[in-house]
Design a protein with these regions (language model features):
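Short, cationic motifs built from Arg/Lys/His that form the positively charged side of catalytic pockets
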Residues: 37, 49, 60, 80, ...
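Conserved nucleic-acid-binding Ia/Ib motif block in the N-terminal RecA-like helicase ATPase lobe
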Residues: 19-30, 76-148, 152-156
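Residue-level signal for pocket-adjacent positions within structured domains
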Residues: 7-10, 61, 109, 121, ...
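The conserved Walker
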Residues: 54-58
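Conserved pre-motif I regulatory segment
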Residues: 2-53
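Short Asp/Glu-rich motifs
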Residues: 44, 122, 163
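Walker A/P-loop NTP-binding motif
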Residues: 38-50, 61-76, 96-102, 141
Length: 163
């Protein structure tokens, strides 16, 4: 009998997810994938677009956030990924989760913009050249109309429906 025991491979590692993201996933207190994550992450890593509907609290944010962060090009300082959220509370919650998930990735920048925040604070966030932008539709449109943000380089990666 072999004295060497095989170490179990983390399910995210088996999907080709970077060590930094796996480390953050564990650091956030998660050790197992939820059903929505098991289904969505491999499809998104293979470049498929998905529409996923699942109850609150089932891990949707990490389900799209993990592949999203894997595709961020740290050498590109333009907005590469955009997440739209219907409310400021949800936008902030998503930004917080993505920030935690990116904790061990050096150089990734995430910004959140939504109504009710001072416009100057949001301009400062955009001027820091985030690769990931979380926004409410109205405030994103406001920045676009003022010429402060152009979606020409952004990718559409997530939608949330309230209710």
């Amino acid at each position: 009998m072999d004295d060497i025991q095989k170490e179990a491979v983390h399910p995210l590692e088996a999907m080709g997810i970077s060590g930094e993201v796996v480390q953050a996933f564990n650091w956030m207190g998660f050790h197992n994938l939820t059903a929505i994550q098991e289904k969505c992450i491999p499809l998104m890593m293979d470049g498929h677009d998905i529409i996923a509907i699942a109850p609150t609290g089932t891990g949707k944010t990490l389900g799209f956030g993990i592949p999203m962060l894997e595709y961020v090009n740290l050498d590109d300082s333009s907005v590469q990924e955009v997440v739209l959220a219907p409310t400021r509370e949800l936008a902030q919650q998503i930004a917080d989760e993505l920030t935690n998930l990116a904790h061990f990735i050096k150089g990734v920048k995430i910004a959140v913009i939504y109504g009710g925040q001072p416009f100057g604070k949001q301009m400062s966030a955009l001027n820091r050249k985030p690769q990931v932008l979380v926004a409410t539709p109205g405030r994103l449109l406001d920045h676009m109309q003022r010429g402060k943000y152009s979606p020409r380089n952004g990718a559409y990666d997530g939608a949330r429906r309230s209710g």
